[in-house]
Curated annotation (Swiss-Prot):
Purpose: Binds double-stranded DNA tightly but without sequence specificity. Involved in DNA compaction.
Outcome after substituting R42A: Decreases DNA-binding
Subcellular location: Cytoplasm; Chromosome
GO molecular function, one term: double-stranded DNA binding
Record GO biological process: chromosome condensation
InterPro entries with a match to the protein in the record: Alba-like_dom_sf, DNA/RNA-bd_Alba, DNA/RNA-bd_Alba-like
Outcome recorded upon mutating R46A: No significant effect on DNA binding
Oligomer and partners: Forms homodimers and homotetramers; oligomerization is enhanced and stabilized by DNA. Interacts with Alba 1.
Name of encoding gene: albA2
Name of the molecule in the record: DNA/RNA-binding protein Alba 2
Keywords: Chromosome, Cytoplasm, DNA condensation, DNA-binding
Length: 102
C-alpha cells in the first residue's frame, strides 16, 4: 500500500464529524503527510463520508492516494449454539497532502 507506516484513523460508531476532526488533526498536527482511514462492515459508509467531507469542505489539498478493499470470513455463534460463517467487508483509504509525497 502507498501509505506504509502512516498513522491510522479507525472508524467506528461515533458521529462522522468526530472522524473528520481526527483525520484533520492527524494530518495537520502530527507532522505527517499521510493518513490511513480504516473501517469494517457497516462503518464503511461512515469512513467514505468522513474522507469526502475532509476533501470537499476542509482541506482541498488532500488526495486519495490508494483504496484497498477486502473481506474476511468470521465464525460467529448463533443464540442456538450453532457456528455460522459470516463475511465482513473492510476498506482502507490512504490520504495524502497534495504535492508532499513521503
Amino acid at each position: 500500500m502507498a501509505c506504509e507506516g502512516a498513522p491510522e484513523v479507525r472508524i467506528g460508531r461515533k458521529p462522522v464529524m468526530n472522524y473528520v476532526l481526527a483525520i484533520l488533526t492527524t494530518l495537520m498536527e502530527q507532522g505527517t503527510n499521510q493518513v490511513v482511514v480504516k473501517a469494517r462492515g457497516r462503518n464503511i459508509n461512515r469512513a467514505v463520508d468522513a474522507v469526502e467531507i475532509v476533501r470537499k469542505r476542509f482541506a482541498k489539498n488532500i488526495e486519495i492516494k490508494d483504496i484497498k478493499i477486502d473481506s474476511q470470513e468470521i465464525e460467529v455463534q448463533t443464540p442456538e449454539g450453532q457456528t455460522r460463517t459470516r463475511r465482513v467487508s473492510s476498506i482502507e483509504i490512504c490520504l495524502e497532502k497534495a504535492g508532499e509525497s513521503a
